[in-house]
Each structure stands twice: as C-alpha cells, then as structure tokens.
Design a protein with these regions (language model features):
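Conserved catalytic core of nucleotide polymerization and phosphodiester-bond processing enzymes
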Residues: 1-197
Length: 197
C-alpha cells in the first residue's frame, strides 16, 4: 500500500520586523541559553580534560606537534577569535586543547582560561544538572556550586564591559554597534550573593 502524509497549517510563524521588540527577546534568550550551556558544562565537566589542560598550562607545553588535528586547530582558532571579538571565552575550548593546540592561545586567553579552570576546580567533583529553560535542578549538596558557576558566567559577561553586548547586537543588526558601558564593577558581580531560586 501507499502511505500518504498530509499536514494542516495551524498557525503562521510571524517574523519580527526590523526595529521591533522581537529582536530584544531573541537576544535575551540567546544570552540565557549561553549562560545555561556554560553553567551545565562547568558542572558536568570532565575531570580528565580539566586536569590535562591545567597540566598543559602549568608545564607551559606550548610547542606545536606534527600530530595536530585540523578540526581541533580550526575550533581553537575560532573560539579564541570569538573571545577576542566578544570578550567572552566559552569553556567549549577545553575539549579542543591538547599539546598540539595549546600554543595557539595568546597570553590573554591563557589567563582567562586559568580563571575558568580555577572556578571549575573550586566546584569540586562533576555533577548532574537538569535544566528547563533557565531553571537548574541539582542535588542539594551542589546548589552552591551551581550558584557559583552562574555568578561566574555573569561576571564574565560584566568583565567584557559591554563588548559582548556590542558583539551580539552587531551580529543581530548586521552593522557595527558600539554602546558605552556603565559604571558596573565586574568584581561586585563576582562577590555578589546572588541566589538562584
């Protein structure tokens, strides 16, 4: 027999018009999703990866080896480039760092990476996180660790001093955007007692 599949249009997807508020919602949701991904990655980190990258930095093993993996090089270069443009280093970079790629990182990226590894190590053992949108579920013993990871992501955004917002808005509007930054001290964010509810 023949199987016929048909569909019925229930509602039409409405796209936002340039200059409307829908751009704002998309930007906010994108930043929320970024924070969520980074927090989950920090909580569910792979101990071996964190140990390997920490050792590479401590040993200053920055020479290139002939066994480089092209895709790893390309991804490290891309993530470092995005860091330079936005001021925000994603911990996705950890998965691509090894003896053959660590030398691609400049001094600023290495320093940012050290801070990230320090926070991950302070969080302790990896643990499972369940998420729904921007809601995190963890065992009670991990609540402070997840809160610390969340605050750290907000600190990283604040530390960009508006560079990340300008980067995102420039992509959204396909033109150079350069807003000023207020008087927020990123250290105040880091030392905040922000509570996730």
């Amino acid at each position: 027999g023949t199987v016929t599949v048909s569909h019925k249009e229930i509602s039409k997807l409405e796209k936002g018009e340039p200059g409307t508020r829908s751009y704002s919602a998309n930007l906010v949701h994108s930043v929320d999703a970024l924070i969520l991904r980074e927090v989950v990655a920090m909580a569910m980190h792979q101990k071996e990866v964190v140990a390997r990258v920490t050792k590479l930095i401590e040993n200053k093993s920055y020479q290139l080896f002939s066994n480089n993996k092209g895709k790893d090089i390309a991804m490290v270069e891309k993530l470092q480039s995005l860091y330079k443009q936005s001021g925000f280093l994603s911990d996705r970079i950890l998965d691509y760092l090894h003896e053959g790629t660590i030398s691609l990182l400049d001094k600023d990226t290495i320093e940012e990476l050290k801070d990230m590894l320090d926070v991950i190590n302070q969080m302790g053992e990896p643990f499972e996180v369940m998420t729904i949108h921007d809601c995190f579920r963890v065992l009670p013993k991990h609540v402070n660790a997840i809160r610390k990871a969340y605050i750290y992501q907000l600190y990283k955004i604040a530390k960009t001093k508006g560079k990340m917002l300008n980067f995102l808005l420039s992509q959204l509007f396909n033109m150079e955007v350069n807003f000023g930054f207020g008087k927020l001290n990123p250290e105040d964010v880091l030392s905040s007692d922000y509570a996730l509810c």
